[in-house]
Amino acid sequence: MTLADLPRFSPRGLLRSGAERRAAAEQLRALNTVPDDPGRITRELSGGNQQKVVLARWLMHECRVLLLDEPTRGVDVGAKAEIYRVVTELSAAGIGVVVVSSELSELAGLCTRVLVMREGEVVAAVDGAAATEHELLRHAVAPTDTEPVLEEIK
């Protein structure tokens, strides 16, 4: 797959016009993907840029909700910052973003609300302002008999 395979206009991975190629290049530039050449083979990119290509692919579909599972695992600090910037902008634009992450600092910094799960059950809902690493970890490891389990999330 190349970077040009991103747009929703090319379901078989073949671009039909320069407009689609320009749209792919624009999305890659918006994510600061290096290089932003839509003809570049994705697997030749760094891990961080590969993650940004995957994100760009979904953004080209104009999704209203994104589910990001470990979006920054294995990427460098610069790519993490770029992904965080994009997630924050998407959320501010009204796009629903659900982030699944084992990095507590990531959740504390990105989320307006964090649901903490333990053994397949939601054990706490923490507002973004109160979502510190310490608070999230406290809920994640608290003994079940002393921590009430959420029955309903409103």
Report each predicted region and the residues it spans.
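Glycine-rich phosphate-binding loops of nucleotide-dependent enzymes
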Residues: 1-154
